[in-house]
Amino acid sequence: MKKTIQRGLFTGALVLLTAMTSKPAHAAVNYQALVDADVKKFQGYFLKEFPGVKLEDFGDGVYALDEDSRKQWKEMEEFPPYELDVEAGKALFNKPFANGKSLGSCFSNGGAVRGMYPYFDEKRKEVITLEMAINECRVANGEKPYAPKKGDIARVSAYIASISRGQKIDVKVKSKAAYDAYMKGKEMFYAKRGQLNMSCSGCHMEYSGRHLRAEIISPALGHTTHFPVFRSKWGEIGTLHRRYAGCNENIGAKPFPAQSKEYRDLEFFQTVMSNGLKFNGPASRK
């Protein structure tokens, strides 16, 4: 799976971005078809860059690209560092609130609902993420919301992810409002920011598979499949939005709050780009 990556960095990404940013000319437009075309181009970019990697394997991140790293990761997953977090998340999910209900009262299918999130709520005109839904359930039942980046929110999310493994990603974008949120997420993915003037795409498309010091830069395709993650760097489990904030800080950009509209729209776009892959969280990462 190792290979030397040679490419025209800027040109390839610019052509892809241009192809993916066409906007509907009128209201009677098939927004889902526009998005599906984006997905095809986006996934095609990575399949071309890494011809030895199957589409479904991109959910494993950098471990789909490098054989030695994958072997080490597989060994670590035999005794996953997030195992206790999943057990704690299960207990929290089933723990009664003061009113006698629980988080389990808010979610169907016994809580195996990871494949339903994120989605665009047409009544509220906003993206709803799993962590947002968890905290809204607590507040609706008279409980305080969890802190949004780590701790109990990540544990409950990890439990839900664990019992939802194998659910296929199939995020729909059917309305203009949903498409607008999708476009906001796409703009954030490609926009340069911070002291280093870097973008999400700059690292995770143009430089994906390359080494940054001792680490391999992960491909953007499949980014959202495996969260929450237990990162060795953190020494604990954390949410996708915690990772977003860390990326912003790394390039000298002020991070947005976890569960902000900006990060929810970005998660929406990134998850759409992984349509067809399967949710496989929680996971361990360096």
UniProtKB/Swiss-Prot annotation:
The observed outcome of changing residue 69 to A is:
In strain: NCIB 8346
Which cysteines share a disulfide bond? Answer: 106-137
Q: Which family does it belong to?
A: Belongs to the SoxA family.
What is this protein for, i.e. what is its function? C-type monoheme cytochrome, which is part of the SoxAX cytochrome complex involved in sulfur oxidation. The SoxAX complex catalyzes the formation of a heterodisulfide bond between the conserved cysteine residue on a sulfur carrier SoxYZ complex subunit SoxY and thiosulfate or other inorganic sulfur substrates. This leads to the liberation of two electrons, which may be transferred from the SoxAX complex to another cytochrome c and which then may be used for reductive CO(2) fixation.
Source species taxonomy? Bacteria, Pseudomonadati, Chlorobiota, Chlorobiia, Chlorobiales
Q: Which gene encodes it?
A: soxA
* Subunit composition and interactions: Heterodimer of SoxA and SoxX. The SoxAX complex interacts with CT1020, SoxAX-binding protein SaxB (SoxK); this interaction stimulates catalytic activity of the complex.
What would changing residue 155 to K do, according to UniProt?
Answer: In strain: NCIB 8346
PTM remark: Cysteine persulfide at Cys-247.
Q: Can you name the source organism?
A: Chlorobaculum thiosulfatiphilum
Result of mutating residue 56 to A?
In strain: NCIB 8346
From the Swiss-Prot or TrEMBL record, give the protein name. L-cysteine S-thiosulfotransferase subunit SoxA
* Enzyme Commission number(s) of this protein: 2.8.5.2
